[in-house]
Every structure is written in structure tokens, then in C-alpha cells.
């Protein structure tokens, strides 16, 4: 747990603010290098910071490659203007370490260069766990919503790319009174281009890992949410209950939901012959 935590302590200056994303992050220089900072005062509100932190922490918990990430206190010593014209507020925000690479352009060609191809299956799983519609989903009216720029390919060499999990700010953990969402069958994050890269063994491994998720594991993450992110005690309890219940549901159903059950069954029968 927390294998990818990053703990810079202060922001020295802003390097770039024209990043067109819903939370209007800014590229900053910290005492420990460059990072993308999402601040209080962002146009999406403080709850999105909590969702970002929890979603990234859950990906980290499952062993999925993420950016190094953390919570950093902004003291207001410098003024940080956001792209929408707002001003970053003092208090704790979410930060990820900058990496060399680029967002995905939707091509199969780039997916074939990914060295951690198993993380495609795992990313679909964590998106489905937290009900994150902001990478890929199909709305109820049948219209697909896709954001290629929410898939980052870290460049470790000229030929090899590493898929990195990020951006969970719109995850729908649970709404008050809608506990049934824990048993929702919708698959999130499964771009059509991803389907040929789904791996049966990765799906089985992550399903087995979800079986081990207990309330204490989720509570350890939820308890780290800063008070200024405005998630009260009742909502924290709802998130814990929902995430544990949904982990249990997906541990039994994820393989079927992404269409790999028949493949695994055929392989099992073959192995027994």
C-alpha cells in the first residue's frame, strides 16, 4: 500500500497554468521536483480532490502503475491563478509528480508498445470499482463518452511506453441512499481499443485481490482525506461501505462483465484434459 506516495512539502513557483482539464491543474516546482497541483478553489469543488486521492490510492493498493502522488499544503505565499480565472485557495491540495510521456491519441499502435499491458485490464477494473465515467463509458442513451486524454503513456524509452493510472476526480463512489450502485453491472473505462489487450490472468489476479479487501484497508485511505475537502464523517462511512461491497461484487463478477469468462472456462477445461 502507498507504494507510489510522493511527499513534497511546499510549492516554489508556478511553471504552467494553461492545462485544459476540468479541475484546472497547474504545473509547479516543489522542493522535490515538478508536479501537477490540483488546488482548493478549483471549479469542480473540494469533493473532486477527495475522489482523486481515493481513486489513485485504490489503484495503488491494487498494484496498478500510477504517478507518484500525495497531499501538499499550499500556504498562499505565492499567488496561483487557475486557467478559469480563479485563484487557488490556501489549504491542502492533490499533487502528482511530472513524468515524461504523453496522453494517448486513441491508436492501437501505441497500445502495442505498452510494456505493462496487464494494467489495461487492471485500470478497467479500478474504474469499474469506483464507477469512473470520465475515461470511457456508454451513457444510458447509448452514446459513448470517451476521453483519450485521460489515458497517460509514460515514455521510459524511445520504443517502450508504460500505462499510468490517473484522474479519478469524477468517480461515483456512492450517493446517499443508493447503496445498490455497489452491484451495478456497468463496466467503466473499457475503450473498444482496449478489448484485444484484456488479459485473463490479470483479470483473475485482480479479482482475487478484490476478495481480500476489508473495511480496514479502505478506512486507512479514507481517514487520510483532509477536513478541508469537505467529506463529513457520514459520507466517509458511506464510501467505505460502498467500496467494500463493490469490491466483493466485482471479485465474483468482473471477469464475466468484461467478457472473459468463457475464455477462462475453456482454458480451465483444456488444462484438465
Predicted features and spans:
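A short, terminal or domain-edge coil/loop segment
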Residues: 17-23, 90, 119-133, 192-205
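C-terminal catalytic region of ATP-dependent kinase domains
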Residues: 158-273
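A generic structural signal for residues located within well-ordered alpha-helices
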Residues: 50-54, 120-121, 235
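Conserved ATP-binding subdomain of kinase catalytic cores across diverse folds
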Residues: 2-102, 129-133, 168-171
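Conserved kinase catalytic-core segment
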Residues: 108-177
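Short acidic (Asp/Glu) patches
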Residues: 75-83, 106-112, 147
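Aromatic-acidic/polar surface patches that form glycan- and anion
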Residues: 47-48, 115-119, 243
Amino acid at each position: 500500500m502507498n507504494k507510489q506516495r510522493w511527499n513534497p512539502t511546499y510549492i516554489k513557483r508556478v511553471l504552467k497554468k494553461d492545462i485544459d482539464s476540468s479541475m484546472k491543474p497547474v504545473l509547479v516546482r516543489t522542493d522535490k521536483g515538478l508536479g501537477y497541483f490540483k488546488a482548493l478553489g478549483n471549479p469542480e469543488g473540494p469533493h473532486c480532490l477527495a475522489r482523486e486521492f481515493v481513486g489513485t490510492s485504490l489503484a495503488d493498493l491494487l498494484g496498478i502503475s500510477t504517478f507518484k502522488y500525495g497531499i501538499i499544503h499550499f500556504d498562499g505565499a505565492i499567488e496561483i491563478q487557475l486557467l478559469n480565472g480563479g485563484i487557488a485557495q490556501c489549504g491542502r491540495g492533490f499533487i502528482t509528480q511530472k513524468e515524461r510521456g504523453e496522453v494517448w491519441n486513441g491508436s492501437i499502435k501505441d497500445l502495442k508498445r505498452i510494456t505493462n499491458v496487464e494494467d489495461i485490464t487492471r485500470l478497467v477494473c479500478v474504474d469499474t470499482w469506483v464507477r469512473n465515467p470520465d475515461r470511457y463509458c456508454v451513457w444510458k442513451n447509448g452514446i459513448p463518452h470517451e476521453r483519450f486524454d485521460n489515458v497517460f503513456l509514460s515514455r521510459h524509452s524511445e520504443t517502450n511506453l508504460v500505462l499510468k493510472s490517473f484522474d479519478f476526480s469524477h468517480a461515483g463512489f456512492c450517493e446517499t441512499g443508493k447503496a445498490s450502485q455497489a452491484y451495478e453491472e456497468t463496466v467503466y473505462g473499457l475503450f473498444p481499443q482496449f478489448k484485444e489487450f484484456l488479459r485473463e490472468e490479470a483479470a483473475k489476479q485482480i479479482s482475487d485481490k478484490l476478495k481480500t479487501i476489508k473495511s480496514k484497508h479502505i478506512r486507512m485511505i479514507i481517514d487520510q482525506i483532509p477536513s478541508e475537502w469537505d467529506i463529513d464523517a457520514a459520507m466517509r462511512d458511506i464510501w467505505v461501505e460502498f467500496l467494500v461491497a463493490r469490491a466483493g461484487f466485482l471479485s465474483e463478477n468482473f471477469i464475466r462483465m468484461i467478457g472473459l469468462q468463457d475464455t477462462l472456462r475453456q482454458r480451465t477445461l483444456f488444462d484438465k484434459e
